[in-house]
Regions:
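Short clusters of small/polar residues that mark proteolytic maturation junctions
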Residues: 374-375
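A short, polar/charged loop-to-alpha-helix boundary motif
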Residues: 378-394
Length: 497
């Protein structure tokens, strides 16, 4: 994989910049932490070299100064809101986050329940946390929020919220997902800190959009693609331009709310420490791009993936909004992209046409070589492409059988005769298990298995929608999957994916 981002430089520069921001205030900074902390795969895809846990590693450099406060909305507890990527409810994700932070040595100070409502589910959640030794605090709904600034910054607003007792200079405010109330918690804490004579500060940590690269840079366009369902729009920060005469990038929600936030700062502290939304941020990622061309190409690929993902969701569930698709089409146009233009797509379609329109797949390896796979009597197309790619990487002739038909056929019998399956062909996970069994007695199979890490970061395209098993396996291998929004049996009404 070509590297476009200096991760070591980022860890050092980002942690130092946060230390400097802490010093600007009364040695107390509330840092609103947006995005994913442990597994930012979007950032790792568009900034090759950025590690999925880079933000966590950066925080670990500050762990002696930092404590974590996790925020969850009472509404999300009551509605049992689910985090899509993990398939667990927000309240359970709070427990998962506590474990994850503590396992790496970060101090979790407390959990704050926002928009507090005296519901049985909320009280049970608080009781459970308290029994585990985790302190909980309550913040309440404020009538007129966020526009009635005079009421919000008063004893009838933030003053009603419980003051979250914290011990360390850096308080990281994070949450299971968006809409939990992280910024409101930060500002409420500033109100209470100033009441106690502590001139604390606030800052916002968001990786995207990157403020010091062009508005229409592919990295920033890829962020818009990632948030197309929210209809976030990157914009030139007009406040920063007016204050400093410098063009920077922010996104619409932060720009729209800035006058309100600024007014709150003035009421809390007497004057605002910031002249623009960009000022509030601490993101240093833009300074660590070392090969712009690599990041541009990676980001263009990400935009295409997001577009395919939207089309597939529309086909499978019908839940993706038309507005989301239109937004992604606009971004495709802005980035000069078209469907079917990538070599991995072209070769997958060519293989399908060469086999009478049967499902086919292609994998683009890190050296640019594209390996294809067809649907056969033993393997599905993606399983075939996977085995062919491993052979190529291991220098094994393509005609070599790494797993014999005699080993595959009993698995097919198990699937169809005993487990009620209708498709005898092996999925990607099944062929990998068969390959691992063969590796015990075959040096060639073992050599192929050892190439699995080299599939990480490779693009794979299927000419039909894949089963959840195949999609999950590609994901676990770190491969970047796209599919045509077409079922293998298009005339059927029910499709098991």
């Amino acid at each position: 994989m070509k590297i476009g981002f200096d991760n070591d430089k980022y860890l050092a520069m980002q942690s130092e910049h946060i230390r400097e921001r802490i010093k600007k205030f009364d040695n107390k900074l509330y840092l609103e932490f947006g995005g994913k902390l442990f597994d930012d795969y979007h950032a790792s895809r568009v900034l090759p070299g950025f590690q999925p846990d880079s933000k966590l590693q950066m925080l670990l450099q500050l762990k002696e100064q930092a404590e974590i406060v996790i925020v969850i909305s009472a509404e999300d507890i009551i509605s049992s809101k689910v985090r899509g990527d993990y398939g667990i409810t927000y309240d359970l994700d709070v427990l998962r986050l506590i474990d994850a932070f503590q396992e790496v040595g970060l101090y979790v100070g407390s959990v704050c329940v926002t928009k507090y409502t005296a519901a049985a589910e909320v009280e049970a959640f608080e009781k459970r946390l308290n029994s585990l030794g985790i302190r909980t605090f309550r913040h309440y709904k404020i009538p007129g929020y966020p526009n009635d600034v005079a009421r919000i910054v008063s004893d009838e607003g933030y003053g009603r919220n419980e003051y979250i007792e914290t011990e360390r200079p850096l308080v990281v405010i994070t949450a299971p997902g968006p809409g939990s109330g992280k910024m409101a918690v930060c500002l409420s804490q500033l109100y209470h800190e100033y009441k106690r004579g502590v001139k604390a500060g606030y800052a916002k940590f968001e990786t995207f959009p990157i403020w010091n690269i062009p508005l229409k840079h592919p990295v920033n366009l890829a962020y818009e693609a990632a948030t197309a369902d929210l209809n976030d729009v990157n914009m030139i920060d007009p406040f920063h331009l007016e204050a400093y005469g410098v063009t920077t990038v922010n996104y619409n929600r932060d720009i729209e709310i800035f006058p309100v936030v600024n007014a709150m700062f003035e009421l809390i502290a007497g004057q605002s420490p910031y002249k623009s939304p960009t000022d509030m941020g601490v993101n240093m990622a833009g300074n660590c791009i070392v090969d712009d061309a690599v990041c541009c190409e990676a980001s263009r690929k990400e935009i295409v993936r997001r577009y395919y993902k939207c089309l597939c969701e529309q086909k499978i569930t019908g839940t993706a909004k038309e507005s989301e698709r239109y937004k992604l089409e606009l971004l495709m146009n802005q980035a000069g992209l078209t469907m079917g233009a990538r070599e991995v797509e072209k070769q997958a379609h060519a293989r399908s046409e060469a086999t009478g329109g049967a499902p086919a797949a292609a994998i683009e390896l890190s050296d640019g070589t594209v390996i294809t796979g067809k649907t056969g009597p033993l393997l599905g197309a993606t399983a075939s492409a996977l085995i062919n790619a491993l052979k190529y990487l291991a220098g094994i002739p393509q005609e070599t059988d790494l797993v014999s038909a005699a080993a595959i056929e009993p698995i097919q019998t198990l699937k169809t005769n005993y487990l009620g399956g209708k498709n005898p062909r092996l999925h990607t996970d099944e062929i990998l298990i068969a390959l691992s069994s063969s590796a015990a007695s075959s040096d060639l199979a073992a050599a192929a298995m050892h190439q699995l890490p080299n599939l990480k970061g490779c693009d794979v395209h299927s000419t039909v929608l894949l089963s959840s098993v195949d999609s999950s396996t590609q994901n676990r291998l770190g491969m970047y999957l796209t599919c045509d929004p077409v079922y293998e049996e298009e005339d059927r009404k029910y499709h098991k994916l």
